[in-house]
Curated annotation (Swiss-Prot):
Residue numbers binding Zn(2+): C420, C423, C438, C444
Gene Ontology biological-process entries: DNA repair; DNA replication
Start and end residues of each BRCT domain: 603-682
Presence of the UniProt keyword Protein biosynthesis in the record: no
GO cellular component, one term: cytosol
Protein name, per record: DNA ligase
Reactions that this protein is recorded to catalyse: NAD(+) + (deoxyribonucleotide)n-3'-hydroxyl + 5'-phospho-(deoxyribonucleotide)m = (deoxyribonucleotide)n+m + AMP + beta-nicotinamide D-nucleotide
Function: DNA ligase that catalyzes the formation of phosphodiester linkages between 5'-phosphoryl and 3'-hydroxyl groups in double-stranded DNA using NAD as a coenzyme and as the energy source for the reaction. It is essential for DNA replication and repair of damaged DNA.
Keyword Manganese: yes
EC number in record: 6.5.1.2
Length: 682
């Protein structure tokens, strides 16, 4: 029986390669959604996501709960209050060709009796901005939030209030009790250019593109700054709606209704019936793209009939009734001047193309990743080649081809290193893996640096006062060698570093001190054991409950943990067999890092285990997040919408349309008190 990580399909794709693809996508999502600092073009992300979807479709047994295909995006920043979306804000599936549009239409046939080719669609330009939710209570703007990860976003109410085309009060006499408007906030090109001109005059940093400018403006902690930015909203849909009056029964009519009550809607929205009209809209909006005055990157096509939308439903991260048909990414030619080789946390050697600077899709590009030796071979690329780079609203482009007829006579072959460019240890490539790795381990300065950066990262120990530049200084001066050394730093030591004043030094020490109180799962993830990601770390914590049990676990016992196979179990065992690792962990514990052991409570005859539960209304004894966490601890799936598959609706005060729908469907309704009694939390 082959190892799971060694299993491969007929094309030679292995599970390990699939998991590497997932990890790459997770990193790209974090930089795009959380840091507003994308690493790759949208086109490259979309291509990788499409590749992952296709592989998982071919191998459903390889799908894991933490796959990027099973969620929407990334978690919100900690600088803003968090808002839970009552109805998840899902993203859209993408199409990149007419054939993929045909596939989208064809997939509908399994869910509706109507011929998809005869359906009316509401067609909209795909705006390149930031998705937001704006809640009106009794006609007055009450709360606004970013999409975040689709379930939880950031509270940006104060900033949204500063956007001139968003009404603070709806233009109607009898407004709904609650109306959630969903739309895209973006920055028109003229406003973007003026913003950058002012920044240049003041000697300030400019924005790379309008999307980054819009995202940065919305996430200002000071609304006065946001008010000075030329932001605009275009609504594209409705979320929560509570009123005695019924909404229109088509998507197009709902948008026109929003427009009539003062909500801005895009002027290019059209109705189209059938494939040919959909393609005509796509071609038309693409032709208008240069003259619209704002950035778009495709066309959004939505089934117009709301009843059919409900029949079609959703998959894990997107609706079946809508698709984003994206434009081809913009391409330019430039020259490959050199290739540098970078060393990552696990020793992975990554070739980085150094390019003759070229202006592509609004940004000057001079670097591109070449991924690995296989990619260099596939492209047939050599130093001196003229290459085609593709970029779609991002900073780091993708090299998609070589212009062979322009190859110079003095072109130089790219030599993949056999020794680490940092520590000169041997470089090896394990059979079945695309990545070559430095064997130096923590002897390698590059791996130590990346390991420290991982240790302090948000999803690990979350030491936000210790960034990349500080780590580099600490290592250069040999003040820090292991993660445990961070907890031994003193104020006077930090004060001697460049650009480190008394306040900055104290902030760093405060962050380090705060990080001592963590969780077992975070600590395990922070250790950087290869292939032990967030989900695996959480599974280990849930299974063994404490660190001593994990350290003592045998190879066989580790494989009893969910999603831990032979390869991961072997890596965990080897980690604890290395005396240096044990010393570092014990040193960390001695510095005061602590957590509460995971306690698993088994409840006999648990009536909630495996049930689908929806929360609605205002809870008085628990917050919404507390109730959700409590339900999940009982093994429930907490959903944002009521359907025939819902087992329980927990109704707080002022429960609205969800309660009505639950009663119509015969879903069992619990009051907050009944719910608390059922869980034994009173």
């Amino acid at each position: 029986m082959p190892l799971l990580s060694q299993m491969q399909d007929q094309s030679g794709t292995t599970f390990a390669q699939l998991e590497a693809l997932r990890q790459k996508l997770r990193e790209y999502e974090y930089y795009y959604h959380v840091l507003d600092n994308p690493l790759v073009p949208d086109a490259e992300y979309d291509r990788l996501m499409n590749e992952l979807k296709n592989l998982e479709w071919q191998h459903p047994e390889w799908i894991t709960a933490d796959s990027p295909t099973q969620r929407v995006g990334a978690k919100p920043l900690d600088g803003f209050a968090q808002v839970t979306h009552e109805i998840p804000m899902l993203s859209l599936d993408n199409a990149f060709s007419d054939e993929e549009l045909d596939g989208f239409l064809r997939r509908m046939e399994s869910y509706i009796t109507e011929d998809p080719h005869t359906l009316a669609f509401c067609c909209e330009p795909k705006l390149d901005g930031l998705a937001v939710s704006i809640l009106y209570v009794d006609g007055v703007l009450n709360q606004a939030a970013t999409r975040g990860d689709g379930s939880t976003g950031e509270d940006i109410t104060s900033n949204i209030r500063t956007i001139r085309n968003i009404p603070l009060k709806l233009n109607m006499d009898n407004p709904p009790a609650r109306l959630e408007v969903r739309g895209e906030v973006f920055m028109p090109q003229k406003g973007f250019e003026a913003l950058n001109e002012r920044a240049l005059e003041k000697g300030e940093k400019t924005f790379a593109n309008p999307r980054n400018a819009a995202a940065g403006s919305l996430r200002q902690l000071d609304p006065k700054i946001t008010r000075q930015r030329p932001l605009v909203l275009n609504a594209y849909g409705i979320g929560v709606y509570e009123s005695d009056d019924e909404l229109p029964v088509t998507h197009f009519e709902r948008l026109q209704w929003l427009k009539s009550i003062g909500i801005p809607v895009n002027n290019e929205i059209r109705l189209a019936t059938g494939r040919e009209q959909l393609l005509a809209f796509y071609a038309d909006i693409q032709a208008k793209r240069p003259t619209l005055g704002y950035d778009i990157d495709g066309a959004v096509l939505k089934v117009n009939d709301i009843g059919l939308q409900e029949q079609l439903g959703f998959i894990s991260r997107s609706p079946r009734w809508a698709i984003a048909y994206k434009f081809p990414a913009q391409e330019e030619m430039t020259v490959l001047n050199d290739v540098e080789f970078q060393v990552g946390r696990t020793g992975a050697i990554t070739p980085v193309a150094k390019l003759e600077p070229v202006f592509v899709a609004g940004v000057t590009v001079s670097n591109a990743t070449l991924h690995n030796g296989d990619e260099i071979e596939r492209l047939g690329i050599v130093i001196g080649d003229t290459v085609i780079i593709r970029r779609a609203g991002d900073v780091i482009p993708q090299i998609v081809g070589v212009v062979m007829e322009r190859r110079p006579e003095n072109a130089k072959k790219i030599e993949f290193p056999t020794a680490c460019p940092v520590c000169e240890s041997a470089v090896v490539r394990v059979e079945g893996e695309a990545v070559a790795r430095c064997t130096g381990g923590l002897f390698c300065g590059a791996q130590r640096k990346e390991a420290l950066k991982h240790f302090v990262s948000r999803k690990a120990m979350d030491i936000d006062g210790v960034g990349e530049k500080l780590i580099e200084q600490l290592m250069e001066r040999e003040l820090v060698h292991t993660p445990a050394d961070l907890f031994k730093l003193e104020h006077t030591t930090l004060m001697r570093l460049e650009r480190m004043g008394g306040k900055s030094a104290q902030n760093a020490l405060n962050s380090i001190e705060k990080a001592k109180n963590t969780t077992l799962a975070r600590f395990l993830f922070a250790l950087g054991i290869r292939d032990v990601g967030e989900a695996t770390a959480q599974n280990l914590a849930n299974h063994f409950h404490n660190l001593d049990a994990i350290r003592a676990a045998t190879f066989e016992q580790l494989q009893e943990v969910q999603d831990v196979g032979e390869v991961v179990a072997n890596r965990i065992v080897r980690f604890w067999q290395e005396p240096h690792n044990v010393t570092v962990v014990e040193d960390l514990i001695s510095q005061g890092i602590h957590w509460q052991d995971v306690v698993q409570v088994e409840i006999a005859d648990n009536p909630l285990k495996g049930k689908s539960v929806v929360l609605t209304g205002t809870l008085t004894q628990l917050t919404r997040d507390q109730a959700k966490a409590l339900l999940q601890s009982f093994g429930c799936k907490v959903s944002g919408s009521v359907s025939s598959k819902t087992d329980y609706l927990i109704a707080g005060e002022k429960a609205g349309s969800k309660l009505t729908k639950a009663q119509e469907l015969g879903v069992k309704v619990l009051t907050e008190q009944e719910f608390i009694a059922l869980t034994g939390e009173n």
